[in-house]
Amino acid sequence: MVEDLAASYVTLKLENEILQAQVKRLMEENAALQAQIPELQKSGAVKEHEPLRKPSEAQEPPESPEFPAARESQNPWEPPATTEPGEPTKIREPREPSAISELREPPEIKEPQEPPETNESGESSAITEFRGSPEIKEPHLPPKSKEYWGPQELPMVKESWEPPEALDSTAWKPPAVKESQEIQKALESPATQRPQASPRGYDLPAVCEAEPTDNQGTPALKELQSPQLHNPTNDEESQTVPEYQETSSQLEPLEHPPPQETLEPRVPQEPLDPSDAEEFLELSVPEESLEGLIVARTGTEQAQCELEATTLPLEYPLAFSEDFQKLSEFLVQLTSYLRSRGYPTEAALVSFVGSFFSGEAGRMFQPLLDSQPPLVEQFERLLRALQDTFDNPESLEVANQGLPQLRQGEGLAPRYSTRFHLIAQELDLGESTLCIQFQEELASSIQNELSCTSPATNLSDVIIECVTLEEKASGGVDSSSSSSEEENGSEGPPTENQPVQATSNRPHLSEAERARRREGHLCLYCGHPGHFARDCPVKPHRVQQAGNMEARR
C-alpha cells in the first residue's frame, strides 16, 4: 500500500510540473488572445439577447477567445494550486478519474482541432485531472480548489485528452460576465453539486456536463464574465448545449426548490408595507381563532348538556347527611335517576344507594342493613325502612344520649332496632348484655312473644326475631281487616286464613332447630332455603302485600 501511494504521489508531482509548464504556455497564449478581446466583445454584445444566455451556454466547450480572460483571472490561482502537492491517500482517487477521462476523451479531441479548442481542451483535461488533485487536497484546499480548477484545466487539456472540453470551460467563464445574474443563480446549484459532477466527468458524454457545472461554481466566473461567449465559435459547440441544459435543468430543481420553499413564507411579496402585513396578520389570526372558538364552544356546550342530563336528577343533594326533612325529596330524585340508569341486581342497587348517605344518615344506614339483612336484596323495602327510620329525627337525640333513654314505645321494631344497633356500635358491651338491654326496651307485646322462645345470644338474631314477631302481629290485623274482601268471593283470602291459624297455633322453635336453620341459611319461619323469615311467602302478610301490589298495578 505504501509503495503504491508513493508511486502515485511521484506521478502526481510530475503531472503538477507538467501542468505548471502548460500554465506558462497558456499565459503566453492569453497575452496574444487579449488583443482579440475587444472584437469578441462586440460580437458578444450582439448575441446578448439570444437564447445562449442560459447557464448551459456558459458551460459550452469550444471558444478560443475566452481563454485569455479565464487565464488572466486564473493566473494567480493556478500556480499555487499546482505547486501544492496532494497527500498520498488523496492521490488514489484523482488518478483513477484522470485516467478514465484521459482514456475516454480522445474522441472528443478529434472533433475540434482548432488551436483555441486545444487551449480549451487543456482546461477540460485540467478539470478532470485536477479534480482528482483537489479531491486529494480536499481537507487542505477546499476553497482554493474552486479557483484553481480554471487554470489547471487550461494546461491539462492541451496535452492531456480533452481539448474541446477545455474550450467549454474557458468559454463559459468569460461569457458569464454578461450573464452575471443568471450565473449567480446557477452557481448555488452547481457548486453544491460538484461531487455529483465529478463522477459524470469520467463518462464520455457526461464529461462536458460535469465540467461546466464545476466551472460555474468557481468564483472566477464572476470576475471573468465577458461577452466572449457569444463568439461564432459557440455555434460549433452549440450542439453540446442541450446536454448541458439537461444537466443543469436536472440539477437546479434539486437544489433551488428547497430554498424557494423556505423563502416564500419568510418574504411574502404581497404585504410589502409593514402596515399591510400587520393588517393581514390581524385578519388571518382572528378568523382562525373564531372558528376554533366556535368549534370549542359547541363541543363544550354539547358536553355540558350531556353532563347536565346525567347529573340533573341529583342536583340538590349529592349525599344525604342530616337534613331528614328532605329525605322524601332525595328519595324521589334518587329513584328517578336509578330508573334511567338501571342495575343488574337488587343488591348492587342497594349498595349504590348506600353510597349517597353520609354523616349521621350514613352512620344509621349500615346498622339498618345489619339489623335487617333482607333489605340488602329488596330495594322497595329498603326505601320503606329508610322512611320509617328517618321519619322522626327527634328520636336521634334520645339515641345519642345512650341505651337507657332508648325505648321502642309505639314505634316500629325496625326503627328501634336500627337506633339500638347504632348506639351499640359505640359501646364496649358483650353480645349477651346487648341482647338483654334490647329486649327490656321492646314493646310489651313483643316481649311476651320473645319470652316463649329460647333466649338468643346474638343481637342480630334477636333483632330479626323481634321484627318477625311484629310483622306477624301486623299481618293478623291486616287479615282481619281484609275480611270484606274474603266475603266478596275471592279465592285468595280463604287460603290466607289457613296460615294465619297455623301461625297462631304454631309452636316456637327450639334452640337446636333455630341454630340448624341459621347454619343452613334457612328461613326461620318455614324452614325452606332461598329467603329470610321477613320475606317468607308462607306468611299471610306476604300474600296480602302481593294482592295489594296487583291492585295498584
UniProtKB/Swiss-Prot annotation:
It holds the Pfam family zf-CCHC. Keywords: Coiled coil, Metal-binding, Nucleus, Zinc, Zinc-finger. GO terms for cellular component: nucleus. Residues 2-43 form a coiled coil. It is found in: Nucleus. A zinc finger (CCHC-type) spans 523-537. Residues 118-127, 239-250, 495-507 have a biased composition (Polar residues). May function as a transcriptional regulator. Plays a role in postnatal myogenesis, may be involved in the regulation of satellite cells self-renewal. This is Retrotransposon Gag-like protein 3. It comes from Mus musculus (Mouse).
